[in-house]
């Protein structure tokens, strides 16, 4: 099996190195990652300029693009042999609930949806590196164990690991996405010439974070696994919309 590894924190990120180290002695791995931090890039593709891969001394491939660019090229001709699976991470910071809409880590995994095996997105619920070994351990454990899975095509597994030592993790839970409250207002700054700018504020706290959600699992010390799909159709709205459209036709 050949795994394509990517991330959104950039090719020099410690989480990427930890993920590669955890998986490379298990199976063949190739790394294609953004040359700089692309957190929050979601599923954006670069369409206004060419992409130039750089082959680094450690064997990684650096790309002047987004996480989705990296996986897209990796699956469509940049590599001599197509990977069997895409694994993204390890992100420093949670990708819980609404975060998946913006996350480049999750987007990289979603770009691997056409492969026959499920893609994984791994995130450590911390900006600090102290418990990266915990996240790397569970990444290896879950990727190794995936062979017995019988999942629908185009399934992506979003995994969040609590910021705890390995022996403090209580287990692994299957969860749904929770929801965050609305983010705080952007922070306005004014430069010395009087020109206004804005910093995007931090994400909102968990608004729907009760039992069964990814938020609740990690707060209780469990690794959270949430299966994601690309189809965002809101089926519960069909009945209301059917009646509404009848009056318009």
Swiss-Prot record:
The answer to whether keyword Membrane applies is no
Q: What is its main location?
A: cytoplasm
Cofactor(s), names only, from the UniProt record: a divalent metal cation
Q: Which GO terms describe its cellular component?
A: cytoplasm
Ordered alphabetically, the record's keywords are: Cytoplasm, Hydrolase, Metal-binding, Nucleotide-binding
State the free-text cofactor note.
Answer: Binds 1 divalent metal cation per subunit.
Q: Where does a divalent metal cation bind?
A: 8-9, 39, 91
Give the molecular function GO annotations.
3'-nucleotidase activity; 5'-nucleotidase activity; exopolyphosphatase activity; metal ion binding; nucleotide binding
Q: Which domain of life is it from?
A: Bacteria
Provide the protein's localization: Cytoplasm
EC number in record:
3.1.3.5
Reaction equation(s) it catalyzes: a ribonucleoside 5'-phosphate + H2O = a ribonucleoside + phosphate
Question: What would be one Pfam family of this protein?
Answer: SurE
Q: Which InterPro entries match?
A: SurE, SurE-like_Pase/nucleotidase, SurE-like_sf
Gene3D superfamilies on file: Survival protein SurE-like phosphatase/nucleotidase
What does the record give as the function of this protein?
A: Nucleotidase that shows phosphatase activity on nucleoside 5'-monophosphates.
Which family does this protein fall into? Answer: Belongs to the SurE nucleotidase family.
What's this protein's name?
A: 5'-nucleotidase SurE
Can you name the source organism?
A: Pseudomonas fluorescens (strain Pf0-1)
């Amino acid at each position: 099996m050949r795994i394509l590894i990517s991330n959104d924190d950039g090719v020099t990120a410690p989480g990427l190195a930890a993920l590669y180290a955890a998986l490379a002695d298990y199976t063949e791995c190739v790394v294609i990652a953004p040359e700089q931090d692309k957190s929050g890039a979601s599923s954006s593709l670069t369409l206004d300029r060419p992409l130039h891969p750089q082959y680094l001394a450690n064997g990684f491939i650096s790309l002047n693009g987004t996480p989705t660019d990296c996986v897209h090229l990796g699956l469509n001709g940049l590599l001599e042999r197509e990977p069997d699976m895409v694994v993204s991470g390890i992100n420093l910071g949670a990708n819980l609930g609404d975060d998946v809409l913006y996350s480049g880590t999750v987007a990289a995994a979603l770009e691997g949806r056409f492969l026959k095996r499920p893609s994984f997105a791994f995130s450590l619920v911390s900006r600090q590196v102290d418990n990266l070994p915990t996240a790397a351990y569970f990444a290896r454990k879950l990727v190794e164990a995936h062979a017995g899975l019988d999942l629908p095509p185009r399934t992506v597994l979003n995994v969040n690991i609590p910021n705890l030592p390995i022996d403090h993790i209580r287990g692994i839970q299957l969860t749904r996405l929770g929801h965050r409250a609305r983010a705080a207002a952007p922070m306005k700054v004014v430069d010395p010439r009087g020109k206004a700018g804005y910093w995007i504020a931090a994400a909102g706290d968990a608004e729907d974070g009760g039992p069964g959600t990814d938020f609740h699992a990690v707060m209780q010390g469990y690794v959270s696994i949430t299966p994601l799909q690309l189809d965002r159709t809101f089926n519960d709205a069909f009945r209301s919309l059917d009646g509404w459209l009848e009056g318009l036709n």
